[in-house]
A protein has these predicted regions:
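C-terminal lobe and adjacent flexible extensions of AdoMet/dcAdoMet transferase-like proteins
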Residues: 194-232
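Conserved class I S-adenosyl-L-methionine
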Residues: 1-34
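A conserved beta-strand element that flanks and buttresses the S-adenosyl-L-methionine
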Residues: 103-105
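Class I SAM-dependent methyltransferase SAM/SAH-binding core
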Residues: 48-92
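A short acidic, Gly/Pro-enriched loop at the edge of an enzyme's catalytic core
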Residues: 94-101
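SAM-dependent methyltransferase
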Residues: 132, 136-199
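A short glycine-rich, Lys/Arg-flanked "PGG" loop and its adjoining helix->strand segment in the class I
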Residues: 119-131
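Class I SAM-dependent methyltransferase "Motif I" SAM/SAH-binding loop
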Residues: 40-43
């Protein structure tokens, strides 16, 4: 059972304010063509706009509940034919196809707890790519300001939806809790410094094309967010 299953119906209203990455991932999908593989597809926050732009999406997620919401949203939008949704793990995606683009949006790789798991996931993504194909993902590491503002406090993130962040700077973990009425879940995220992601990509056989500091493609120059583009 995924930690997202209890909050599958809560996820969209919880993340409703997260829109800054959608056009970026849709543009990259259009540049690569159908199909694209999206790892951690969730409820289709990015996959459905991608499908609406005319791109077929093979979406993998470890939460059956999130995939059910994604399928429902796809049907409601008349896009079910463009969505191929599969239950599976980031480290062992159930995909035999070879594609030009694999994405892992919205920090999904931070669910991986060790370098061993990260390398397994990166190698799996590389295995889905045709020669020259690209992996695009985004991750973050917190600023001290982030930690100071949020640590150990319940904060109303959206109307009726509370979120709590418990940061452990020594272990580089974020224990994130979300709740609405009787729906609640807690998950752990493990962050890394950008230099470490760069080294892991190289170890997994990728060549890094770009590391951006935001979805406007500004080159990374320090800060919390990194957006990585690497090719096989």
């Amino acid at each position: 059972v995924s930690s997202y299953d209890p909050i599958a119906r809560l996820y969209d209203p919880w993340s409703t304010g997260v829109i800054e990455d959608i056009s970026f991932y849709v543009e990259e999908a259009l540049a690569s063509g159908s199909p694209v593989v999206e790892l951690g597809v969730g409820t289709g926050r990015i996959a459905i706009p991608t499908a609406a732009a005319g791109i077929d999406v093979i979406g993998v997620d470890s939460s059956a509940g999130m995939l059910a919401v994604c399928a429902e949203r796809g049907r409601d939008a008349g896009l079910a034919a463009r969505l191929d949704l599969r239950l599976g793990d980031l480290r062992r995606p159930p995909v035999d196809e070879r594609v030009e683009l694999v994405t892992c949006p919205f920090r999904a790789y931070l669910h991986l707890a060790s370098d061993e798991e990260r390398l397994e996931a990166l190698a799996a993504a590389r295995g889905l790519l045709r020669p020259g194909g690209r992996l695009i993902f985004d991750v973050f590491r917190p600023s001290q300001e982030d930690v100071d503002e949020t640590n150990g406090r319940w904060i109303e993130r959206e109307p009726g939806i509370d979120e709590r962040a418990d940061w452990d700077l020594d272990r580089q973990t974020l224990t994130l809790s979300v709740r609405r009425a009787d729906e609640q879940s807690t998950m752990t995220l493990w962050w890394l410094e950008p230099e470490r992601w760069n080294a892991l990509l190289a170890e997994a056989g990728f060549e890094v094309d770009a590391c951006y500091g935001w979805f406007d493609r500004t080159p990374y120059a320090g800060g919390e967010d990194t957006v990585w583009i690497a090719h096989r």
